[in-house]
Structures are given as structure tokens and as C-alpha cells.
């Protein structure tokens, strides 16, 4: 669109006047720009992190041409972060995939062949053959899927149905296993229900913010802007930031704490001890609403059973616990004295006391925020449990301005991975595959034979890598994720399985990522507003958007791929005879007919869409697929504390926070007057537990799986930077973001660099026991590691830092610890 200088100035003047009058800028744009087709604006949640910012998307002539913060969005109130402003450009990279690609030689599939353009029918032909062969020869455990916290809600639901009900395989897991699994298990252990009890409105009412392993200034910048506003507007507000290295969030900190890796467990127990020793327990809350339990210890590190660390563990993978008295709990935390804590953590005593006083002060409303520093941790579940302890001891929970809050990193890690239940052990609404009653509920709702869903937990993310390497998992489909770059221990545990000739790997992606280029078949995927979608953010807010443009070429949404592929299988090909005998009416039907084109899902006509409304999947099928899938899925949570609103309500609103009961969303769960599931007179009720009480756990410090030694003498921590998101497969295709941070660097303390004869800008080889990468020395800038630790982001495909990382996981959540392994440096 071209504008004369006069028109441009006129547009700016009108926009400024409109802003002053409180009018929306898109309306002004339509009024001013008359030379060509006007830009059409519609709402959508941002494509990036779990904050869930609302944006206005401008489309013209079939392309997304503009994006701005939505002033009516309650999350961001019209403000975007730097990534959000460049959303249109993520869709139009020069190497966007538009047609399926198969490795071929001499006209047919070959594992060592070159990628060759094929049709969708050809792609599904080879997929069908590979899936059916694996199912026939080795059974459902030989196939698997790795999905995403970036799936829309109905994409995740469709995938879970296809694998768990259709193929009878629980080998489906999301990449949220790498980021949110510890939070999930922590919530379930303490409260019996997943996801935070508070919301973002807490920010404007809190007196203190404590960040545990969360660089919100770069990873959740819009929320950080709200915290900054609260801190700078009120001199009595305090910010404490804890990390293993100094980062941009420290710029606002009143108490910036650098601790030795893994010793956050010590600090958490010290604060609990401080609260007890200073008689700061909220006795009324504690006596009515809390139970105490002692957890199993020495639980291993989630490595292969043959690993020496696993052999040495007394209780590998144990989630066991037993009741304990308050006196026993008091004695347990009493060992974590101020002196011992300062010694183990390297944190000055006065800083530790200042931190503990925030929680102990009955007049201070405290919010605890955390992300990957807690979750990507070999004791991540414990860390989650221990921070809940502090809020439960003091009663600072489920009320405006105070509570524990786990922040998510992906746009629908909550709404899709967690709530839908795309983990290998989960079903919708916090149900699990190991519970016969839960399986029965799903099987009846889905009208499939009893016993269809396997009771055995499937392979989690890291276990999938190991099974591929071992030749046990032979057909593997990944969607909306770049795990060859993002997952741990690439050299030893991932690449061997992907390139094993016994295995067939399918990657659905918009771009030729590291994962796509390591696959055998690449399926081009529609992204963001090229499809109708729904995400669920960190504060339980479910948000919808409409399809606003069509995908380029033959790119198709993940939902289309799943549903169309299901047509290739009849029930007799995937279910044993004893199951078919229970529902003989399903014989001869395709999985498409059994799972998707059912009376329950297909009852909403496509005529519910406006005539000019894009919806490629529904118009092709002849019914409103997204609405049918959502309403079927939402049934599982309604009446059980996971209530979602009717489908149409979300297109009208800027998101709603569940539980949504009688048209009203819930800001604070578990407290009387805020949560519709808490009756008058109950005060608080943690209704995920049978007795309505939350659990305080006694859990000790246990060391990291791998620490520096004489040879590998530095800690390595990995993470992100503001300008790029995860592996950079979208943001590195935005020229402005790429120029702002073009390549990964190794952040290192100047004295550590000097001791190794390294200077800023030097090339350096970073070496672990598993691999090596070459990076660039950075002794200045935004991240300032202490001596003994280096930090490296993972967005750069040319510097695969996960060649270095260890595939140790939290044994309870199976989430990888990307924050702690040992490396050495060699000058290049």
C-alpha cells in the first residue's frame, strides 16, 4: 500500500486525535486509506509466549500486512513486546514450505535420498504404509507423536483422540514436557488440580514480587511492564529476583540474589524454617486447610536405568509420601539454618533474611513467579512443591495480590498440552490413563469400545528419543515443534534414532527447521491466523481467533492433516477383534468416521460461519469442525472445576478465565466469594483433593545430576533472549529481530575469560562429555554470569547448544534439566 506524504500525515493526525478520544486506530485506518482495499482488522492472541497478549491483525489482499496491540485486551492493554510487533513477518519467510517433501531416490522413498516434492496423496500413501506396517508387526507401542504447546486446543484434542483412541497408543507427548511438566506434577501433588489459582490482576494489588528462576524482563516482557509500573508507582512495593546469573530483571530488583545452581531447594526450606521460627504461620488457615506429608528421597535423575546415577538411587522415580506431624516438619526444616543456607548457596545472610521477611510479614501480599529455572530442574517438582509450602504456611494464596504463579512459555501449554491432556499419561480435564474410571468416561463420551484406551503410560519426550535410538519406536510424527534443536543431548540420544533406517520420521512445520531437515517426510503447515484457533494462557484464559488469510501453496493446518490422515484407517486395521465385538456397529468405519465425523462433533453446520468467513477445514468437510471438537472436549471439564464457556462466547470476548460458570469467569480459585465451587462458610477449599486440603511437603536438598569437576570446570545454563523465541524458527526469519541478535554468544564472567586467555569476540569451543559447539565470547551485555558459570541461548541453529546438555530429567515430571551440566572451554 502506497500513501502520499499528505495522506500519510493526515493518517497520523487522525490517528493521534482518535487515540486522544479513546477511539480504535484500525477504524481510523479504514476511514483514511481509500485509495486501495482497506485493511481488515480482527483480533487474535499473540503467536509467541504463554502471556496471551491480544493483538489486532490487519489483512489486505489475502496477506497479513499489519499488527498492533489490542487496546481492549485485558492482558496487555494495547502494548506488544518487540516480537509481537513483527508477527506478520513470521509468516512470510523466503523459505516457507508450500508442498510436501519426501526423501527419494530413483523415484521412491529412500532414507538416504534427497528431499523431493510430492503431493499430499503421495505423502499420506507412504505414511499409511509405514503406520500400518508398524502396527501390524510390532503393535501400537511402535508408533508415536511429539506435539506442542503451540497446537491450538482442537489440534491437540484431535491428535490425542487419534493416538489414544484410534491407534490405541499413549506414545503422544507435547514439547511442554520440556517446559511445564514439573509445574503440572507440582500442582497435582499439592492441590490435586493443575494450573495457577491466581491471575494477572494480582500484579496491581501485590506488595512484593519474588522471581524464582524467571527472567520476566525478557521472557514475559508485557507482564514485566505491569510489574515495573506497580513497583515504580508505589515506594512500598518490593521486587526480589533469584537466579544463577544476573540478567535484565535484576535492574528492577530491590534484592537481587545469585545462588549456586540447584541450591534454590535450600533457600526454600530456609524460608519455611524462618516462618516457623518467627511465629509467622497463619494458624487459622494452616489448621483448617493444610495437610503435611514427607516425600520419598534419593529418587534418581530420570536417566537410562543402566546409568550409574540411576543404579545408585535408592528410590528411583518414586512419588511416594507419608503423613507427618507438624513437629516432625518443624524439625525437618530446622536443619536449614541461616548459616547453613548461606554456606550452601553462596548468598549473603542479609539478603536471605530480607527475602524470608517478605513471606513472613503478615501485612505483605506476595506473589511468587517462576518459569524454567524451577521447572527445568532435576528436582523441579520439589521446587514447585516447596514454594507452595511458603504460601500455605502463611495463607498468602487464592486472594487478590498474593499467591504462587507458574508462568508458561508457550501460547497454549496450558490450554492444549495440560487442559486437553496431550501428555503421555493424561486425558482431558486432569484425568489420567492409569485410572480406569477416567478411561471409561472418555470411552463412553467418544463412543468407542471399553478397553480401547491403554492403561499403560506412554513414552514421554526423552523416552521417545531413547526408544527411537533403540529401534522400539519406528514411526514418529512431530508437529509444531523443533525438537532436534530444542531437546537435550542431540548427539547421543536424538539424532541416532532419527537417522536409523528402521525408523520413519515425519515433521509437520512451516519452515525447513533442523528437525525438518533431519526427517524423512516434511509436511507444510499452516500457521497462526491461516487457520481458526484457540489458545489457553498462563492465567487460565482461553482465547479464540478466526482464520484471516489462507496458507500459501498447499500448506495445511495440523488439524487438517490429522483428520484427513484418519480416513486412511478402518477400525479392523487398528483394533483387535475383542474390542470390535463390543461395538460391532463400528466395523468397516474409518477412524475419521469414528473420531471426528460423529453425530456429536458434526452437529454444528457450516452455515454458522458468516458467508465471507474463512475456515478451510470446516468448509471442506461440510460441518463446523472446530466448534464440534471444542464442545465435545469442553464437556469433560464442565461441572468439575474446569468449566469452559460455550464456543460462541469466546469469539465475542477477549478471552475468559476458567472455571466459567453461569457466564462468569473466575479470577481466584479455591477461595470463598471468588470461586463458584467454594460454598459460603467454607473460606477456602482445595477441591482437587478429596478432603479439600492442600499438602505441604517435606523435601530435602539433593545435588544436580552433573556438576563441574577438575576437567569440566564450569556450569552451563541455557535459555532464551528477548528478540528470539525458542529455536528461532520464526523470529530469525524476521530481518529486524535477526539483526538485533544475529547469532548466539557465550556469556561468561570476565575473570573466567581472562583465566582462559579469552577476550570478548573470540571464538571459543564449548565442550561437554556429550558434544561440542563453537560460539563467541561475550563478557558484557545483558547477562552477567558469576564466576564458574556460562550462559548460552538456544535460538541459533548454527550453534546447537543442546549437543552439550545432559538428558537428565526430574524423575517425577520427566522434564529435562537444561540449566545445569558441566562444560570446559577451549580457545579456537
Swiss-Prot record:
Residues 39-95 form the 4Fe-4S Mo/W bis-MGD-type domain. It comes from the Bacteria. One of its GO terms (molecular function) is nitrate reductase (cytochrome) activity. The keyword Disulfide bond does not apply. Residues 1-31 form the signal peptide. Keywords: 4Fe-4S, Electron transport, Iron, Iron-sulfur, Metal-binding, Molybdenum, Nitrate assimilation, Oxidoreductase, Periplasm, Signal, Transport. It is found in: Periplasm. It holds the Pfam family Molydop_binding. Binds 1 [4Fe-4S] cluster. It catalyses: 2 Fe(II)-[cytochrome] + nitrate + 2 H(+) = 2 Fe(III)-[cytochrome] + nitrite + H2O. GO terms for biological process: cellular respiration; Mo-molybdopterin cofactor biosynthetic process; nitrate assimilation. Substrate binds at residue 794. It is an enzyme of class 1 (oxidoreductase). GO terms for cellular component: membrane; nitrate reductase complex; periplasmic space. [4Fe-4S] cluster binds at residues 46, 49, 53, 81. Predicted to be exported by the Tat system. The position of the signal peptide cleavage has not been experimentally proven. Its cofactor is [4Fe-4S] cluster; Mo-bis(molybdopterin guanine dinucleotide). Gene3D superfamilies: 2.40.40.20, 3.30.200.210, 3.40.50.740, Dimethylsulfoxide Reductase, domain 2. Its EC number is 1.9.6.1. SMART domains: Molybdop_Fe4S4 (SM00926). Mo-bis(molybdopterin guanine dinucleotide) binds at residues 83, 150, 175, 179, 212-219, 243-247, 262-264, 372, 376, 482, 508-509, 531, 558, 718-727, 802, 819. Component of the periplasmic nitrate reductase NapAB complex composed of NapA and NapB. Belongs to the prokaryotic molybdopterin-containing oxidoreductase family. NasA/NapA/NarB subfamily. Catalytic subunit of the periplasmic nitrate reductase complex NapAB. Receives electrons from NapB and catalyzes the reduction of nitrate to nitrite. This is Periplasmic nitrate reductase. The gene is napA.
Amino acid at each position: 500500500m502506497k500513501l502520499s506524504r499528505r495522506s500519510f500525515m493526515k493518517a497520523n493526525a487522525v490517528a493521534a486525535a482518535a487515540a486522544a478520544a479513546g477511539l480504535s486506530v484500525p477504524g481510523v485506518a479504514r476511514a483514511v486509506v481509500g485509495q486501495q482495499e482497506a485493511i481488515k482488522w480482527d483480533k487474535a492472541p499473540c503467536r509467541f509466549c504463554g502471556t496471551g497478549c491480544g493483538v489486532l491483525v490487519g489483512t489486505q489482499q489475502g496477506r497479513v500486512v499489519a499488527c498492533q496491540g489490542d487496546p481492549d485486551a485485558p492482558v496487555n492493554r494495547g502494548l506488544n513486546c518487540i516480537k509481537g510487533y513483527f508477527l506478520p513477518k513470521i509468516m512470510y519467510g523466503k523459505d516457507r514450505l508450500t508442498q510436501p517433501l519426501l526423501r527419494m531416490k530413483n523415484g521412491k522413498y529412500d532414507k538416504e535420498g534427497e528431499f523431493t516434492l510430492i503431493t499430499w496423496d503421495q505423502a499420506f500413501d507412504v505414511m499409511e504404509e509405514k503406520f500400518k506396517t508398524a502396527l501390524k508387526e510390532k503393535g501400537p507401542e511402535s508408533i508415536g507423536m511429539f506435539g506442542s504447546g503451540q497446537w491450538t486446543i482442537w489440534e491437540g484434542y484431535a491428535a490425542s483422540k487419534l493416538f489414544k483412541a484410534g491407534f490405541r497408543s499413549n506414545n503422544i507427548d507435547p514439547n511442554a514436557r520440556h517446559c511445564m511438566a514439573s509445574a503440572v506434577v507440582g500442582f497435582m501433588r499439592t492441590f490435586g488440580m493443575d494450573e495457577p489459582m491466581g491471575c494477572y490482576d494480582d500484579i496491581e494489588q501485590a506488595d512484593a514480587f519474588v522471581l524464582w528462576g524467571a527472567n520476566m524482563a525478557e521472557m514475559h516482557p508485557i507482564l514485566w511492564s505491569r510489574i515495573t509500573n506497580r513497583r515504580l508507582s508505589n515506594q512500598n512495593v518490593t521486587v526480589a529476583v533469584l537466579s544463577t546469573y544476573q540478567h535484565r530483571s535484576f535492574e528492577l530488583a530491590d534484592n537481587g540474589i545469585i545462588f549456586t545452581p540447584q541450591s534454590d531447594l535450600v533457600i526454600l526450606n530456609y524460608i519455611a524454617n524462618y516462618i516457623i521460627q518467627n511465629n509467622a504461620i497463619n494458624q487459622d488457615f494452616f489448621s483448617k486447610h493444610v495437610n503435611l506429608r514427607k516425600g520419598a528421597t534419593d529418587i534418581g535423575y530420570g536417566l537410562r536405568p543402566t546409568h550409574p546415577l540411576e543404579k545408585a538411587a535408592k528410590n528411583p522415580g518414586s512419588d511416594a509420601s507419608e503423613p507427618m506431624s507438624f513437629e516432625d516438619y518443624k524439625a525437618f526444616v530446622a536443619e536449614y539454618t541461616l548459616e547453613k543456607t548461606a554456606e550452601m548457596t553462596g548468598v549473603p545472610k542479609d539478603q536471605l533474611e530480607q527475602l524470608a521477611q517478605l513471606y513472613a510479614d503478615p501485612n505483605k501480599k506476595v506473589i511468587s513467579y517462576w518459569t524454567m529455572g524451577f521447572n527445568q530442574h532435576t528436582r523441579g517438582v520439589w521446587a514447585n512443591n516447596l514454594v507452595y509450602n511458603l504460601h500455605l504456611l502463611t495463607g498468602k494464596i487464592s486472594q487478590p495480590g498474593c499467591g504462587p504463579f507458574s508462568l508458561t512459555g508457550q501460547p497454549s501449554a496450558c490450554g492444549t498440552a495440560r487442559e486437553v491432556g496431550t501428555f503421555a499419561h493424561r486425558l482431558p480435564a486432569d484425568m489420567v490413563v492409569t485410572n480406569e474410571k477416567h478411561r471409561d468416561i472418555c470411552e463412553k463420551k467418544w463412543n468407542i469400545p471399553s478397553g480401547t484406551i491403554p492403561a499403560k503410560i506412554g513414552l514421554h519426550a526423552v523416552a521417545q528419543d531413547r526408544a527411537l535410538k533403540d529401534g522400539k519406536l519406528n514411526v514418529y510424527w512431530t508437529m509444531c515443534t523443533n525438537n532436534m534443536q530444542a531437546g537435550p543431548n542431540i548427539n547421543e540420544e536424538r539424532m541416532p534414532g532419527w537417522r536409523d533406517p528402521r525408523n520413519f520420521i515425519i515433521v509437520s512445520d512451516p519452515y525447513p527447521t533442523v528437525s525438518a531437515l533431519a526427517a524423512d517426510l516434511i509436511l507444510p503447515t499452516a500457521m497462526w491466523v491461516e487457520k481458526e484457533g484457540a489458545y489457553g494462557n498462563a492465567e487460565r484464559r482461553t482465547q479464540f481467533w478466526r482464520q484471516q488469510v489462507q496458507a500459501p501453496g498447499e500448506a495445511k493446518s495440523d488439524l487438517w492433516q490429522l483428520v484427513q490422515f484418519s480416513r486412511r484407517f478402518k477400525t479392523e486395521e487398528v483394533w483387535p477383534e475383542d474390542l470390535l465385538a463390543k461395538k460391532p456397529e463400528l466395523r468397516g468405519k474409518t477412524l475419521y468416521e469414528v473420531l471426528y465425523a460423529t453425530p456429536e462433533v458434526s452437529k454444528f453446520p457450516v452455515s454458522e460461519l458468516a458467508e465471507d468467513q474463512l475456515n478451510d477445514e470446516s468448509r471442506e468437510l461440510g460441518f463446523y469442525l472446530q466448534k464440534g471438537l471444542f464442545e465435545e472436549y469442553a464437556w469433560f471439564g464442565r461441572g468439575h472445576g474446569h468449566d469452559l464457556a460455550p464456543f460462541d462466547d469466546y469469539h465475542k470476548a477477549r478471552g475468559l478465565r476458567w472455571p466459567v460458570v453461569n457466564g462468569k469467569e473466575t479470577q481466584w480459585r479455591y477461595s470463598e466469594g471468588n470461586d463458584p465451587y467454594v460454598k459460603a462458610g467454607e473460606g477456602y477449599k482445595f477441591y482437587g483433593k478429596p478432603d479439600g486440603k492442600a499438602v505441604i511437603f517435606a523435601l530435602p536438598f539433593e545435588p544436580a545430576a552433573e556438576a563441574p569437576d577438575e576437567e569440566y570446570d564450569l556450569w552451563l545454563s541455557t535459555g532464551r533472549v528477548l528478540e528470539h523465541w525458542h529455536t528461532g524458527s520464526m523470529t530469525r526469519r524476521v530481518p529486524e529481530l535477526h539483526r538485533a541478535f544475529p547469532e548466539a554468544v557465550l556469556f561468561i564472567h570476565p575473570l573466567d575469560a581472562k583465566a582462559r586467555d579469552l577476550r570478548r569476540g573470540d571464538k571459543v569451543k564449548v565442550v561437554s562429555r556429550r558434544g561440542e559447539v563453537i560460539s563467541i565470547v561475550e563478557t558484557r551485555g545483558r547477562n552477567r554470569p558469576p564466576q564458574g558459570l556460562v550462559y548460552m541461548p538456544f535460538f541459533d541453529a548454527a550453534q546447537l547448544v543442546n549437543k552439550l546438555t545432559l538428558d537428565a530429567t526430574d524423575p517425577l515430571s520427566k522434564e529435562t534439566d537444561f540449566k545445569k551440566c558441566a562444560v570446559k572451554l577451549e580457545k579456537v
